[in-house]
């Protein structure tokens, strides 16, 4: 396990002074980058190989949204590396040990020079010692787009520089912000999130969000398909509020 301590900042909260979902994802992404940079297979090593870990899917369960100034612990637990695939959990706890959020993620090691997945090297395996997976209700990596429900198209989004990460692709967390901004209902409090990443979006690409809303008991479930100009799904996100 790898972890670091932090405190919820004003720049990370919404109008209710609670941590936003994209800020939570940023914490998780920072945690895995910190572990990578502190180990023998850092980003410079990956760059020399022309490789990067590409996120396939998220599942995030939020038990409570922490508030401004709360002290928190963010951690990650790699639990399996198999061929080109990496599997890791994340968590956010309070300083007192209350679990605030738990997540599962699946990654592929991709060689951008050859355009193919590649097997993790011994150095990478050393960098990410595996442990037992965390307790959570593990769902499918695949997200089916519902045929029923209330469907509408949201305003198109042009990919800007601020959407990009160091791989010159849209950052994983930015897709979540796009999905949230596409909802007619604003300032929703997300309790569960799933995301399946299918393609990479680049600078200047146009994203066409399609939202399908369904009800399940007391919850609203929003499935957001972020499509490219060809109508292909770049990323599909499911939000339970």
PLM regions: where:
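Hot-dog-fold acyl-thioester-processing enzymes
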Residues: 1-55, 102-104, 111-187
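Hydrophobic beta-strand-centered segment that forms part of the acyl-chain substrate-binding groove
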Residues: 35-73, 77-80, 85, 174-213, ...
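HotDog/MaoC-like acyl-thioester-processing domains
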Residues: 2-4, 61, 67-142, 201-203, ...
């Amino acid at each position: 396990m790898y972890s670091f301590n932090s405190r919820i900042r004003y720049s990370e909260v919404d109008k209710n002074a609670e941590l936003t979902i994209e800020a939570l994802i940023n914490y998780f992404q920072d945690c895995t980058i910190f572990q990578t940079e502190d180990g023998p297979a850092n980003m410079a090593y990956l760059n020399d190989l022309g490789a990067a870990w590409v996120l396939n899917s998220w599942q995030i369960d939020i038990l409570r949204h922490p508030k401004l100034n709360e002290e928190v612990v963010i951690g990650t637990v790699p639990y399996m590396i198999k061929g080109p695939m990496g599997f890791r959990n994340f968590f956010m706890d309070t300083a007192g040990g209350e679990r605030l959020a738990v997540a599962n993620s699946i990654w592929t090691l991709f060689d951008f020079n050859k355009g193919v997945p590649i097997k993790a090297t011994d150095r990478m395996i050393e960098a990410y010692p595996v442990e037992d997976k965390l307790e959570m209700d593990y769902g499918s990596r695949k997200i089916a787009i519902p045929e029923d429900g209330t469907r509408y198209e949201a305003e198109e989004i042009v990919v800007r520089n601020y959407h990009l990460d160091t791989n010159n692709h849209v950052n994983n967390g930015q897709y979540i912000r796009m999905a949230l901004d596409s909802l007619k209902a604003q300032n929703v409090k997300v309790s569960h999130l799933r995301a399946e990443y299918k393609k990479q979006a680049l600078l200047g690409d146009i994203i066409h969000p399609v939202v399908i809303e369904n009800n399940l008991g007391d919850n609203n479930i929003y499935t957001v398909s972020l499509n490219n100009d060809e109508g292909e799904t770049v990323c599909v996100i499911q939000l339970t509020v």
